[in-house]
């Protein structure tokens, strides 16, 4: 297969090789990169874990994972190529001897080592220390870290300080997989390559913005993790705020890594603080009760296996976000995310202001607003809703909302739309950090989120119940209705 010019020979070391993330996401993504010819012929993939496996045992585990989680049959020729890259190192992250063994396996000149931490953040410090003591932290070595990076600003700083003791910021790749989604990446092109939007992307023309990330699933057996995190920490602090920054950022001087990140940080620093004085006006917490999702009976959050029956952890959050800068002053951003909602979808809806003069007042006291809908999943694409005259001989101008719909899969005729992890893994191999989160981004997001969490805690605020299979508590509808607006109806 042809190798792209940006591919580099590297050693990809996966800590937590037998874990859920590696099996469900990383290995299938590596298979697809192999299929597309993006992996350099000399690149190796080394699984790391405490299991007493040899290379053959690990190869068997990888094959089983691919056969389970790939969405297509395993190609024998591709499998042969991929399996030839595989190796395994038995290692306990607290054992220095294990890192010495890993160092022996990696003892090759002019190769980049990518250390992917597919393990809990509580282990990151020990892994970095082990790599550092074994001399495996020198550039161009890289580390890739998964969320959650802490549970608040203080704990996030502890983790980042542990990593920074052994790795420079230019070596650190913090993953938010939403940044690898094709439609999120398309936001830059949509906004800055098209004069239709580039010249009309501020408070002069935009009325408000809605960002919805909805999940049909519950906690999927992750009670221990989720009850400590909740929807605010699990989704708002990272995914939704990252999407918000991509929508709200000003044009960067160029598309280099730090220019883009600098603009995103400016947005985070401009978020209006939410505290006890306004938290009940602009936020809603919810917790699902039993109900029906897609016609199937599902238990409530407090009825899930292993549940603490007195838990006040939120499974739904809606927030009105105000950005205090010249571009967005007076334009609210409404964020909404939850579990056990009617359907799985992620979308951004930009509502444009109506013309100052309504020439069609005989038919419409208020015109329906033009909308730009950016679908992040499941059917990635962009939809514009505009008004057109309904054909006919009627002397009145009867208008109808018309959709201009661009579906990525149909428009670009691609059988396989690259998964976010495929792109992010490839970017780590290329050494490009633009799609990863810089430390100051993480910490600015935590500052804003912590203020809300503290306000909830001080008021002993309990989440409002909502039935599984509905769009969250009634209070979330009331919050946006008070502003004279309504949530976009997800189709």
From Swiss-Prot:
Pfam families, per the entry: G6PD_C, G6PD_N
Residues annotated as the enzyme's active site: 239
GO cellular component: cytosol
Keywords, ordered alphabetically: Carbohydrate metabolism, Glucose metabolism, NADP, Oxidoreductase
Binding site for NADP(+): 50, 92-93, 147
Reactions mediated catalytically: D-glucose 6-phosphate + NADP(+) = 6-phospho-D-glucono-1,5-lactone + NADPH + H(+)
Domain of life: Bacteria
Gene Ontology molecular-function annotations: glucose-6-phosphate dehydrogenase activity; NADP binding
Gene Ontology biological process terms, A to Z: glucose metabolic process; pentose-phosphate shunt, oxidative branch
Pathway given in the UniProt record: Carbohydrate degradation; pentose phosphate pathway; D-ribulose 5-phosphate from D-glucose 6-phosphate (oxidative stage): step 1/3
E.C. code: 1.1.1.49
Claim: Cytoplasm is one of the keywords in the record: no
Residue sites binding substrate per the record: 177, 181, 215, 234, 339, 344
Role description: Catalyzes the oxidation of glucose 6-phosphate to 6-phosphogluconolactone.
Assigned protein family: Belongs to the glucose-6-phosphate dehydrogenase family.
Protein name: Glucose-6-phosphate 1-dehydrogenase
Gene of this entry: zwf
């Amino acid at each position: 297969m042809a190798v792209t010019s940006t591919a580099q020979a590297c050693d990809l070391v996966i800590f937590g090789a037998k874990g859920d993330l590696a099996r469900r996401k990383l290995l299938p993504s590596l298979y697809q990169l192999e299929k597309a010819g993006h992996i350099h012929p000399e690149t190796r993939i080394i699984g790391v874990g405490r299991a007493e496996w040899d290379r053959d045992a690990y190869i068997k585990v990888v094959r089983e994972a691919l056969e389970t989680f790939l969405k297509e049959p395993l190609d024998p020729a591709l499998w042969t190529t991929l399996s030839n890259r595989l190796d395994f190192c038995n290692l306990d992250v607290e054992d220095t001897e294990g890192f010495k063994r890993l160092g022996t396996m990696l003892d090759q000149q002019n190769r980049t080592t990518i250390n992917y931490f597919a393990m809990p953040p509580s282990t990151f410090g020990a892994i970095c220390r082990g790599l550092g003591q074994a001399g495996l932290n020198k550039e161009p070595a890289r580390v890739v870290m998964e969320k959650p990076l802490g549970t608040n600003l203080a704990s996030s700083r502890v983790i980042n300080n542990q990593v920074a003791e052994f790795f420079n910021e230019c070596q650190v790749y913090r993953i938010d997989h939403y940044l690898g989604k094709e439609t999120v990446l398309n936001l830059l092109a949509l906004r800055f390559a098209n004069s239709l939007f580039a010249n009309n992307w501020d408070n002069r023309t935009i009325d408000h913005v809605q960002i919805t990330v909805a999940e049909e699933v519950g906690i999927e057996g992750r009670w221990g993790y989720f009850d400590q995190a909740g929807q605010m920490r699990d989704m708002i602090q990272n995914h939704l705020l990252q999407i918000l920054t991509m929508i709200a950022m000003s044009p960067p001087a160029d598309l280099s890594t730090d220019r883009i990140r600098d603009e995103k940080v400016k947005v985070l620093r401009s978020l209006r603080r939410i505290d006890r004085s306004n938290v009940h006006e602009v936020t809603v917490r919810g917790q699902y009760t039993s109900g029906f999702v897609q016609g199937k009976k599902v238990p409530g959050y407090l009825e899930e296996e292993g549940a603490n029956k007195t838990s006040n952890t939120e499974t739904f959050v809606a927030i009105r976000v105000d950005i205090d800068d010249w571009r967005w002053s007076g334009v609210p951003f409404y964020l909404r995310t939850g579990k056990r909602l009617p359907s799985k979808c992620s979308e951004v809806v930009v509502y444009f202001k109506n013309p100052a003069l309504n020439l069609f007042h005989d038919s419409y006291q208020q015109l329906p607003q033009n909308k730009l809908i950016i679908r992040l999943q499941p059917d990635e694409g962009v939809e514009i809703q505009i008004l057109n005259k309904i054909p006919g001989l009627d002397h009145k101008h009867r208008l109808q909302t018309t959709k201009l719909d661009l579906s990525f899969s149909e428009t670009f005729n691609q059988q396989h739309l690259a998964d976010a992890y495929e792109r992010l893994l490839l970017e780590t191999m290329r050494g490009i950090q633009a799609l990863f989160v810089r430390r100051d981004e993480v910490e600015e997001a935590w500052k804003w989120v912590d203020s809300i969490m503290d306000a909830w805690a001080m008021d002993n605020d309990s989440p409002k119940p909502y039935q599984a299979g509905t769009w969250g508590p009634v209070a979330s509808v009331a919050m946006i209705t008070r502003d004279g607006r309504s949530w976009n109806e997800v189709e």
